[in-house]
Amino acid sequence: MLDVNFFDELRIGLATADDIRQWSYGEVKKPETINYRTLKPEKDGLFCEKIFGPTRDWECYCGKYKRVRFKGIICERCGVEVTRAKVRRERMGHIELAAPVTHIWYFKGVPSRLGYLLDLAPKDLEKIIYFAAYVITSVDEELRHNELSTLEAEMEVEKKAVADQRDADLEARAQKLEADLAELEAEGAKSDVRRKVKDGGEREMRQIRDRAQRELDRLDEIWNTFTKLAPKQLIVDEVLYRELTDRYGEYFTGAMGAESIQKLMENFDIDAEAESLRETIRTGKGQKKLRALKRLKVVAAFQANGNSPMGMVLDAVPVIPPELRPMVQLDGGRFATSDLNDLYRRVINRNNRLKRLIDLGAPEIIVNNEKRMLQESVDALFDNGRRGRPVTGPGNRPLKSLSDLLKGKQGRFRQNLLGKRVDYSGRSVIVVGPQLKLHQCGLPKLMALELFKPFVMKRLVDLNHAQNIKSAKRMVERQRPQVWDVLEEVIAEHPVLLNRAPTLHRLGIQAFEPQLVEGKAIQLHPLVCEAFNADFDGDQMAVHLPLSAEAQAEARILMLSSNNILSPASGRPLAMPRLDMVTGLYYLTRLEEGAKGEYRPATADAPEFGVYSSPAEAQMAVDRGELTVRSKIKVRLTDQRPPKDVEAELFPEGWQRGDAWTTETTLGRVLFNELLPADYPFINEPMPKKRQATIINDLAERYPMIVVAQTVDKLKDAGFYWATRSGVTVSMSDVLVPPEKAEIMERYEAQSDQIEKKYQRGALDHQERNNALVKIWQEATEEVGKALRAHYPADNPIITIVDSGATGNFTQTRTLAGMKGLVTNPKGEFIPRPIKSSFREGLTVLEYFINTHGARKGLADTALRTADSGYLTRRLVDVSQDVIVREHDCGTERGIVVPIAEKQPDGSIIRDPHVETSTYARTLAADAVDANGNVIVAKGADLGDPALEALLEAGITEVKVRSVLTCTTGTGVCATCYGRSMATGKLVDIGEAVGIVAAQSIGEPGTQLTMRTFHQGGVAGDDITGGLPRVQELFEARVPKGKAPIAEVSGRVRLEDDDRFYKITIIPDDGGEEVVYDKLSKRQRLRVFKHDDGTERLLSDGDHVEVGQQLLEGAADPHEVLRVMGPRQVQVHLVHEVQEVYRSQGVSIHDKHIEVIVRQMLRRVTIIDSGSTEFLPGSLTERAEFEAANRRVVAEGGEPASGRPVLMGITKASLATDSWLSAASFQETTRVLTDAAINCRSDKLIGLKENVIIGKLIPAGTGINRYRNIQVQPTEEARAAAYAVPSYDDTYYSPDSFGSSTGAAVPLDDYGFSDYR
C-alpha cells in the first residue's frame, strides 16, 4: 500500500480501457457468485479466487498448497496465487464488453459533457446511444464530389425510368377504359353503369400517378439527403438509412449506439475545435458566443491536460474487489449480498448473451436491442436511476449503484472518510462532580480499566505481578486487587478527552485528568457544563484516550479545560459560576439592613459597636452567633488590597501586603474577596452574575490562566457552600399575588369594553380594534408588573434568584404571580384576548387553549432550527476550512477604520456599544493619534481592554485596525491581520485553523436565533426576514425578500407619490444622467435616516442622499452594493448585517469570525476579457491567481485580463474550491467528480478536509510543516541524562512529575516559544 505521507497531491482523471485492463487481475466471465453447496467462489465468477486472490490466508482453492512457506506460488491446478486473503480488498477484475458503452456521468450530467464536446444536443445523443437513430460518422467528401455528376445522371435515369413506367401504365389503362366503355355502349348499358366504370378507371389512374410520385419523392429525398450528408447528422428513419447504405454505402459510414460515439471521438480534432471556438468567441454575439464559451470549457479541458476523451466511452468495465461488495451468509442459510453484485451480474449476463448473438450472426435488430440493454445495465451499475426508472431489487427498492456509495451522509466520503469510529473510547451518563478541580473529571473504575487495559497489562508485567501479557490480561479481566493499584499509577498524568454530542464548537471536546470514582457514571466539573452545553438530566458523554506522547502533550497543553476558560467566539469567559453558585455568592455579598451585630457609629453615651480588628475576629463572632455574614461591620484588613481610590489616598507609594486599612463592609464580602488573587482591589458591593462576569473577565485580561482557573474553582466551592446555607427555596407561599391586581384589571376591562362598543357601532374597523386592544392590554400587563415588583420584599427567594442572575427573569415572575398578558398566534400576531390569570391563580380553559398555540410553536421551531443551524455550520466549515494562519505578518499597510466612540454635541464621548466585538483584540494598522498629535497607542499594538481605555480617555473616536479582509497572504491569513486569538487572549499562533473556529463561532449560537419572520405589530406589510433565515440569506448572497433599492449616485432626491407606488428620481451632484427608481411598492416604507441638521426623519422630496444609501425600509441586495460601492463596502455591509441579527438575540460574536467567512465569499473574480492570459471569458478564478497571471503577462509585454469581483454564496464558494476532494465530500458529489475528472484536476492537499479524507495529519496546529520538521539539538546535560545508566537508588524510578504534581494547568506564559518561529 502507498503511504499517505509520501505524496503531495492527488490527481483524478479519465481511465481508458487500457488502464482498466492494466489494473485488472483477470476477466470476470460468468455471473456466478459462490457455489451454494460448497460455499466456495465459482471459477471465473464475481468472487473467483483465481482473479481476486484466496479466501483463506496462504491457501489455494484446491487445497494443494497450505502454509505460509508456499508464499507467492501460483497453484498449477486451480491457478490461485498463495498469498494473504486481504488482497481480496485491493485486487480488481474487469469485464470485456462485446460492444462499447458510454459512461453515464459524462452523457447524462448537467451540462452533458459528451454533448458539449461533440456539439450534439443531449436529446439527439440519447437517441444515438440508445439505438433510436443512426448518426453519420464520416463522409468521403472528395469521392462524393468527384462522382456527383455520374451519380446525378444515374439518379436522373432512374427517375426517368419511373416516369416512363408511369406514362406507359397510364396509357395502357386509358386504352383499356376506352375499350370497356365502347363495349358497354354496344351492349346498351345504363348511363350510371357507364359512369361507375369510368370513375373506377380514373381512380386507378390516379393511384398509378400517386405511386409514381411517391417513388420520385423518395428518390429526391434520398438524393438530397446524400448530397447534404455530413458527419454528426442524425437519421431517424431506418428505411431511408438502409436505402442510403444500399445505394451509396461506399461514400459514407454511419452507425448507432456507443460505437458511433467512439468513432466520432476518434476523428475529433481537439486543437482545431478549440481554435474555431476561440474564434467564435472573439467575433460572435449573444447565444452563439455563450454556447461557444460553454463548449470551450470542456474542449479546453481535454486540450490542456492531454486527457483522452476516449475515456468517456468504455470497452471494458472494471469490477471492484469482492471484499468491498461482500456476500455473507445469514442464519437460516440465506445470503445477504451487496447490491453491486446484482448490478454486475446483469452486466455480465447481457454481455455474454450479446457475444453469443454476434457469434450466431443474429439479425441486426436483435443485436442492437441487446446492445441497448447492455448500455442500460452499465448505466445502472454506475449511477442507478440517473436515466429512466431505476433498477429495483426485492421489495421494489432501488439498488445502490457505485455513485450512491459516494453520495450523501451515508456515502463513503461523509460516513467513512470524514468520520470514523475509534478505539480506546467509551461513553456513559454524566453526573455532577462538585469536589473536582477544574482540570479534573471523575472516570468510573470499570471504564478506566477497560480504556487503559494495555497500559495496565504492560505495567503488571513490568512489576512482576504477572509472568507474561496473557496472564496479565487474565488478571485484568478477573479484576484482581493489585490491578487497581496499577491502574491508579497508570492513570496519573494521563489526560483523557471528554466529548458531548452535538459538538457545536471546539469546546465540545476538552481534556481532563481522570480521577477514579466508584459507580458507572462519569463525573463532570460544574463549570465546564456551559461549554459542553451539558446538564445532568441524563446526558451522556464519550471518553477518548490520547495515546502517543504528542497527543498527550497536545491534550494537556491545548485542550485541558483549565486552559479553555475563554470562549473562542467572543473572548469572554465561559467557565464562570452559574445557577446555585451565583445564588450562593450573591447571598454572601448582600448587605442586610438591621441584621444582628451590625455596626453602629459612636454616640455620646455609647462607643461604636461592631468593629473588628481582623476578619478572623469577625468570624469568631459569627461562630458564637453574635453576628451574621450579611451584617454591616467595620473591619481592619491587612491581606487585601484596597480599592483604587482608597489606595491612592492612603498609600501614595502603592499598597504592600501587610499594610492595614479599615473599611465598612460585611464579613461575607471579605470572605468573597479572599477568593480573588491577593493583589486584586477589594470589591465592596453585592455580586449578581453580571458583576461576577466582569470580574472573571478582568482576571482573564490581567492574570495568567492558571490563576484564573484556581480563582473560578474557589468561587465554585464558595458558591455551592453558601447556596446551601442561604436556604433559597421556592414554594407556593413565595409566589405573592399583588393585591392591586383586581383594581388594575377592572380599569383596563372598562377601556377594552369601550373599544368593543365602538367596534360594534362600526366606528372602528377590525384592524384598528385589534391594534387598540393590543395596546391597552400591553399597558395593563406592564402596570401589573410594576405593582408586583413593588409588592415583593427584597429577601423573597424568587426575587433573589432573579436578581442574582442565577436563572429566570422578571417576565417569568410576572407570569407566575401577576398575569401572562398577550400571547401570539402561530403567525406571530398578537391575539387581542389577554391571559388575565397568573399561573399561581390558574388559567381558564380558553386562556389555556390560547396559550398552547405559542408553546407548541416554540417546540416545533426549536426542532426545525436545530437542523437548519447544523446545516449552516456545515456549509460555513466547508467554505472556510482552508483558512489557516500561515505566516506571522503579511506586511500590508491596509486596514479598516472602526469607530470606538461617538462624539456628543456637548463634546463628551460615548463609548461605542460594539467595541467588544469590533475593535477589541485586533492589531492597530496605524498610530492612534489624539487631537494634539501625541501617539496614544503605537502601530502594531494589540488592542486589549487597557489600550482601549487609554484611547477613549484621549478622546479618539475611530482607529484603523488590521483585518482579515485586507490581508494579502496568498492562502490563509497572517497572524497580525487576524489579531488576538479570542480563546487564549494572545496573538494567534501560526497554524491555527481560524476558518473552522470562525465557522463554529457563527454556527454554534445558530440554534438560539429565532426562526420566525417578524411582523411589525400585526401590520400587513412585507415580512422582514430575521433570525436564522436572514443569516442564511446573507451568507448565501441571495437577493433578499423585499429588497430595498440603494442610491447609485450622490444627489438630490425627487419623490413622486401616486396611490400605489413611489417613484424616486436622483439628480446627481456631478450633473450626470438622472437615476430613476420606478414602481416602488408603498408597502415598503421610506427609510429613516439622519439629515444634515442632525435630526432623524423619513426620506422626503428634496433630500440629499449619498451613494449607496438605502432609500426604502428592508434589506439591500448585496450584489447591488458590490456593483455600486465595490468589494470593500460589501464586506463591511455583510459583516454589519450578520452582526445585527446576532446582537438582536444578545449573542456576542467577534467581527473577525464573520470577516473570515465574508473574505471567502469574495475570493473570486469573473473574467470579462482574457487579454493574453489563458483564462476563458466568463470563468471564475481566484483573485490571487488572477493577479499573478496578469503580472506575468504584463512582464512579458502582453495584454492583461480584465475581471470583475463576484460575490458567491457559501455553498457555491465551497463547490468552486480548488480542492476536488473537499468539494466532492460537501455536496453534489457526482457532478464535482465528473468535472474534476474531465479537467484532470489535481488536489494540492492544502485544506483540512482533503487531508482528513486521505488520512494525513491535518496541516493546522501542530500538524503544520514548520512544527512537524523541528529537530531538537540536546544540550550537554540533556545528552548526559539521556544516555546515563540509571541505578536503582536514583530518583529515576519515582514517578516523574510535570509542573507541580497537582496536574493543574500548565502556566504557558512562563515558556517562550519564540525560538520555534
Curated annotation (Swiss-Prot):
Binding positions (Mg(2+)): D535, D537, D539
Gene3D superfamilies: 1.10.132.30, 1.10.150.390, 1.10.1790.20, 1.10.40.90, 2.40.40.20, 2.40.50.100, RNA polymerase II, clamp domain, RNA polymerase Rpb1, domain 3
An annotated Gene Ontology molecular function: DNA-directed RNA polymerase activity
UniProt entry tagged with the keyword Transferase: yes
UniProt keyword annotation of Chloroplast present: no
CDD domains to which the protein is assigned, alphabetical: RNAP_beta'_C (cd02655), RNAP_beta'_N (cd01609)
Keywords: DNA-directed RNA polymerase, Magnesium, Metal-binding, Nucleotidyltransferase, Transcription, Transferase, Zinc
Cofactor binding notes: Binds 1 Mg(2+) ion per subunit. Binds 2 Zn(2+) ions per subunit.
First and last residue of the signal peptide: none
Cofactor(s) needed for function: Mg(2+); Zn(2+)
SUPFAM superfamilies, alphabetized: beta and beta-prime subunits of DNA dependent RNA-polymerase
Protein residues bound to Zn(2+) 1: C60, C62, C75, C78
Residue spans crossing the bilayer: none
Function recorded in the entry: DNA-dependent RNA polymerase catalyzes the transcription of DNA into RNA using the four ribonucleoside triphosphates as substrates.
PANTHER family in UniProt: DNA-DIRECTED RNA POLYMERASE (PTHR19376), DNA-DIRECTED RNA POLYMERASE SUBUNIT BETA (PTHR19376:SF54)
HAMAP family documented for this protein: RNApol_bact_RpoC (MF_01322)
Family indicated by similarity: Belongs to the RNA polymerase beta' chain family.
Assembly mode: The RNAP catalytic core consists of 2 alpha, 1 beta, 1 beta' and 1 omega subunit. When a sigma factor is associated with the core the holoenzyme is formed, which can initiate transcription.
Protein name as catalogued: DNA-directed RNA polymerase subunit beta'
Lineage: Bacteria, Bacillati, Actinomycetota, Actinomycetes, Mycobacteriales
